[in-house]
Amino acid sequence: MSHRIVAICLLVVFTFFAGVAMSHGHKGTQPAAQESAAPVKASPAEGYNVHVLAPHLVDGKQMGPYHHYCKVIAPDPQIQCLIYDSTEPNANLVQVEWIYAKKLTRSQVPLQEWNKDWHDHKIEIAGGRVQVLDLPPDKAKEVADLVATTDGMIYHFYFGSTLPTGKMSVAQAVGHKPMTSAEYKNYESK
């Protein structure tokens, strides 16, 4: 009797493994893309889901508003935004913005360089041109309050041509005004 139980157990185990092996080789009706799909791994492109709308100055001309899809990279905060000209699935990626805590930028970026290339998000948000979209009002306010503690730098690299031209400029926030040394150093009380 015990030999029979062992034989049945071995048969069940063998059948199980044979079934598993055959199912991996089975083509069935699954599309080829699904058959070869590896487990989904996290990628740098994931997480750009904070949606912000704001116009920018590009070469001195107000343009946009642009759709920013942003992601927090580090809690300082450090934020990156991919910026598109619309919300359409095939929208053009026209800008990238890097956003850093003022305690980082103000301690490392010389004032003259900051006035040329950076902008203060507290001033931009207070100007009323920035909208945090797709979130309830209380969550949108949390995002705006966090971003108000930062400075941003925007690279604009799409000028509406059919193909890239290699032209690039640093865009600015609408309403940006150069700061004095005292204003720049006194960012915490602003």
Residues of each region from the PLM?
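Bacterial N-terminal signal peptides that target proteins for export
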Residues: 1-9
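Aromatic-enriched hydrophobic runs in primary sequence
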Residues: 4-5, 15, 27-29
